[in-house]
Amino acid sequence: MDTILNRILTHKRVEVERQRIKIPDAQIRARAEAAPPPRDFAAALRAHRPIALIAEVKKASPSKGVLIENFDPLALAHTYASNGASAISVLTDVRFFQGSLKHLEGIRAMVDRGAVPPLPLLRKDFIIDPYQVAEARAYGADALLLIVAALDDETLAALLALTHSFGMQALVEVHNEDELRRALDAGASIIGVNNRDLHSFTTTLETTRRLAALLPSSNRPLLVSESGIFTAEHVALVRSWGADAILVGEALVTAPDISSKVRELGGGS
């Protein structure tokens, strides 16, 4: 089936091989192993109650095109960190989201020199290859996104284990009951429920309600609600369903006053 996700993954395989030629596996792994210790992504989410905000540095999307003109990833991250975000998600997909690893690297440098609070950084991309895991750590990620719909069980388990071996954590993204079961079977401790169907790109917050009810009560993973969250009412809704955190991009970058929107969605004043 020719879906948006399948088109993205087809291109991603080519992109990874091109990147591997530029910076070979051994070199990117050495850079990853030499990177400063990662910050604790899960702890940052748990520390912020009643709900944590993962604020996303996002220029564009496949469905809506460019979302913010005069895009400045460092200024955006600074605004997020200064207004109460718990973590920062950085889109690094070039072709479909107009992101870049350079954005991640630049934001990490800004955090490390103390220009903003020391928030953990999440690499948001379509990660399908071990190379990208090492690459995430090399460029400063503390955590990364693994999309269950893009991976078979063996690859999901291998990428999750490799992520942990670098000291990073994984936000394991699901959209339906089968994907949630697969994520739990793989040992995911942070589950991201994407309210957007990556095949059709339609969105409903009901996805969070439906899947939150299926989480185990013992050793319950952290639950992050992703996509379709635009108002404080939306935040209250997903929180009432058991979300520990929200991941928001579009609502922030399209807001007339980004600082105020961060405080609104993050529960600040």
Swiss-Prot record:
Stored InterPro entries: Aldolase_TIM (IPR013785), Indole-3-glycerol_P_synth (IPR045186), Indole-3-glycerol_P_synth_dom (IPR013798), Indole-3-GlycerolPSynthase_CS (IPR001468), RibuloseP-bd_barrel (IPR011060)
Catalytic reactions on record: 1-(2-carboxyphenylamino)-1-deoxy-D-ribulose 5-phosphate + H(+) = (1S,2R)-1-C-(indol-3-yl)glycerol 3-phosphate + CO2 + H2O
EC number(s) from the headed UniProt entry: 4.1.1.48
Pfam families cross-referenced by the UniProt entry: IGPS
Pathway given in the UniProt record: Amino-acid biosynthesis; L-tryptophan biosynthesis; L-tryptophan from chorismate: step 4/5
Annotated keywords: Amino-acid biosynthesis, Aromatic amino acid biosynthesis, Decarboxylase, Lyase, Tryptophan biosynthesis
Coiled-coil portions: none
GO molecular function: indole-3-glycerol-phosphate synthase activity; phosphoribosylanthranilate isomerase activity
Cross-referenced PROSITE patterns: IGPS
Keyword 4Fe-4S: no
Swiss-Prot/TrEMBL GO biological process terms: L-tryptophan biosynthetic process
Family: Belongs to the TrpC family.
NCBIfam families membership: PRK00278.2-4
Listed name of the protein: Indole-3-glycerol phosphate synthase
Originating species: Roseiflexus sp. (strain RS-1)
